[in-house]
Swiss-Prot record:
Pfam family, one: Cyclin_N
InterPro entries found in the cross-reference section: Cyclin, Cyclin-like_dom, Cyclin-like_sf, Cyclin_N, Cyclins_cyclin-box
Chain positions covered by the region annotation Disordered: 1-21
Signal peptide positions on this chain: none
Record GO biological process: cell division
The entry's keywords: Cell cycle, Cell division, Cyclin
Biological function: Essential for the control of the cell cycle at the G1/S (start) transition. Interacts with the CDC2 protein kinase to form MPF.
Recorded family membership: Belongs to the cyclin family.
Superkingdom classification of source: Eukaryota
Name of the protein described by the UniProt record: Putative G1/S-specific cyclin
Length: 245
């Protein structure tokens, strides 16, 4: 009987080193492998510049963050947006909080809605982007916010971020590290669920997406497959040195 994997990846530091495949690749397979490695290197460069620095966020904001992110996850689900949209919106919001101080949870929630709307326009097809009126339905009661004010908040956020919206989220790395169909589809789906569950936890916010993606994939493999399957799956990931921003 096959034993389940018992890899402990409860924290970022526990994520083990991935192993390169030793199988000989030729033709199209080798080209795809080289392309994936180039893509990962480029994404890792971008993530090094767009991962938020937790030390720059005020303690009062960190205290409010878990509840605000949980609310954002709920809004994202109700709007039926893509996984990439949620992950990008959380990154935009965290980066904004690193550079801009504001007062109270109400403003925090409004800016979270603005981040989700910005991310949706960057990720979603045009016909899937929610209208401003739809997004304003989620603005906290007690705060007056019409479309004109919301547009100003959006521009404020973009200016603070220097209009740099692109960011390789954990979902981008999950898809690169674990391509294919069949069981790997289940692994990606479970890894995404694990990643989403990690979002409200402040300790994960400054972890680079590539490291978080490996953590989530390991947990997914550990839950779904035997120890042999875990080694085979994790062995297809590129070599990298776990690090935090």
């Amino acid at each position: 009987m096959l034993k389940r994997a018992t890899v402990d990846v409860s924290s970022p530091a526990d994520v083990p080193q991935p192993k390169r495949r030793k199988a000989y690749l030729t033709g199209a397979d080798q080209a795809r492998d080289e392309y994936a490695e180039d893509a990962i290197k480029h994404m890792e460069y971008i993530e090094s510049e767009t991962t938020p620095d937790k030390r720059c966020i005020p303690a009062s904001v960190l205290e409010m963050r878990p509840e605000v992110i949980r609310s954002l996850i709920k809004i994202h689900k109700e709007l039926n947006l893509l996984p990439q949209t949620l992950l990008l919106s959380v990154n935009l919001l965290d980066r904004f909080c690193c550079k801009k101080d504001f007062l109270g949870q109400v403003y925090y929630r409004v800016f979270s809605c603005a981040a989700l709307w910005i991310a949706s326009k960057f990720v979603e097809d045009k016909d899937r982007v929610p209208s401003v009126c739809r997004v304003l339905d989620y603005v906290p009661s007690g705060m007056y916010c019409n479309s004109a004010l919301f547009f100003r908040l959006e521009i404020c956020m973009l200016n603070v971020l220097a209009w740099r919206v692109n960011h390789p989220t954990p979902w981008c790395f999950i898809q690169l590290f674990c391509p294919g169909e069949g069981n790997k589809t289940k692994v990606r789906e479970l890894a995404l669920d694990i990643c989403t569950a990690r979002l409200p936890e402040n300790r994960w916010m400054a972890i680079r997406p590539s490291i978080l993606a490996r953590h989530c994939l390991l947990h997914a493999c550990n839950n779904l497959f035997s120890d042999t399957s875990l080694v085979e799956m994790y062995g297809s990931m590129p070599r990298d040195k776990p690090s935090t921003h």
